């Protein structure tokens, strides 16, 4: 008989073996984070630092997607990132806000939501 639990652990360890974001502190909705995004321009590769408030967190079988919102030049910008993507070089939690909702979509209607 096949041991499905060990098979599942083996597959998940192979899937996430190259990811550097796997062993870090947990990211929750309401965290103000800064993440480095690897961008390839021609033959050069550079890291673009972005920061914002996590307004949503979605799970699927093998990945976790975060929706990060920031205000840039008076315009709200949202970016959806995959937590275990190889394009994410680093993630740092700058501040944790205590929230009572799982999704903070109501912040889209607020005008001046900034880091306090």
Swiss-Prot record:
Family annotation (SUPFAM superfamilies): Translation proteins SH3-like domain (SSF50104)
Subcellular localization: Plastid, Chloroplast
Cellular component annotations (GO), alphabetically ordered: chloroplast; mitochondrial large ribosomal subunit
InterPro entries in alphabetical order: Ribosomal_bL19, Ribosomal_bL19_CS, Ribosomal_bL19_sf, Translation_prot_SH3-like_sf
Domain of life (superkingdom): Eukaryota
Any one of the GO BP annotations: translation
Organism: Cyanidium caldarium (Red alga)
Family: Belongs to the bacterial ribosomal protein bL19 family.
Disulfide bond positions: none
Pfam families referenced in this protein's UniProt entry, alphabetically: Ribosomal_L19
Protein name listed in UniProt: Large ribosomal subunit protein bL19c
Gene Ontology molecular function, alphabetical: structural constituent of ribosome
